[in-house]
């Protein structure tokens, strides 16, 4: 399975990564050295949307899992901004592309998935089971710095009438990756421009201190809806 569908388009600028945005464990916000231990494709059961499931090994032998959707329900890696009318990349696609670049120096579409079998939780069996996946081996075992934020959000439950997941009254703490850097501390855009001095990671650390918490429940209560992942307003992926 080639990743040609993730090719970048002429006329769409790379924007998301250099902006300061608003597992089984929760860590404080900050920038952490990490190793990629898994990176495999996941196809939506209900549409053409595709995600990349990442597993990162963090300090103190902690593990961070993040599922990043790189295309929408139509299989596109971009959307049309309602205000400007111009196309823009999906935030998930940009984040995954940046992970690929800061770890390999390659664009996401240039990577070649390989067939692997790994243990993944099977909801029908209610346990982990050997599952064939398309693994991005170019990324596996590479190192980077992940910029993480602690988040408070509503727990979700499946609405039996609609089949969709909706917010409940309960809240939970979780972590989200909002930016990535190469092991030298440069973002993908900085690396591409051959920056010589660290800049963005310094600003990132000033904002995302250990005390930083993004409370999604406040915005959701005000709007009466859930907030999109990664703090960027985009149309539904599905």
Where does each model-flagged region fall?
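Short beta-rich binding modules
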Residues: 1-238
């Amino acid at each position: 399975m080639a990743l040609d569908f993730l090719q970048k388009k002429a006329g769409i600028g790379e924007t998301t990564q250099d902006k300061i945005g608003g597992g089984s464990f929760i860590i404080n916000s900050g920038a952490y050295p990490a190793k990629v231990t898994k990176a495999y494709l996941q196809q939506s059961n209900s549409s053409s949307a595709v995600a990349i499931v990442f597993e990162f090994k963090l300090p103190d032998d902690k593990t961070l899992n993040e599922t990043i959707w790189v295309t929408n329900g139509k299989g596109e890696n971009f959307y049309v901004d309602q205000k400007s009318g111009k196309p823009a990349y999906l935030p998930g696609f940009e984040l995954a592309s940046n992970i690929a670049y800061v770890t390999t120096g390659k664009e996401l579409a240039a990577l070649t998935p390989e067939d692997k079998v790994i243990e993944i939780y099977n909801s029908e069996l209610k346990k982990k089971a050997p599952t064939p996946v398309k693994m991005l081996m170019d990324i596996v075992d590479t190192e980077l710095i992940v910029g993480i934020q602690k988040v408070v959000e509503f727990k979700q439950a499946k609405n039996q009438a609609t089949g969709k997941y909706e917010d409940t009254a309960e809240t939970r703490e979780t972590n989200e990756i909002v930016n990535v850097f190469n092991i030298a501390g440069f973002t993908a855009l900085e690396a591409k421009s051959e920056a010589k001095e660290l800049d963005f990671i310094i600003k990132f650390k000033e904002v995302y201190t250990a005390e930083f918490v993004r409370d999604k429940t406040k915005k959701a209560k005000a709007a009466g809806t859930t907030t999109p992942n990664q703090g960027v307003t985009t149309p539904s992926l599905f």
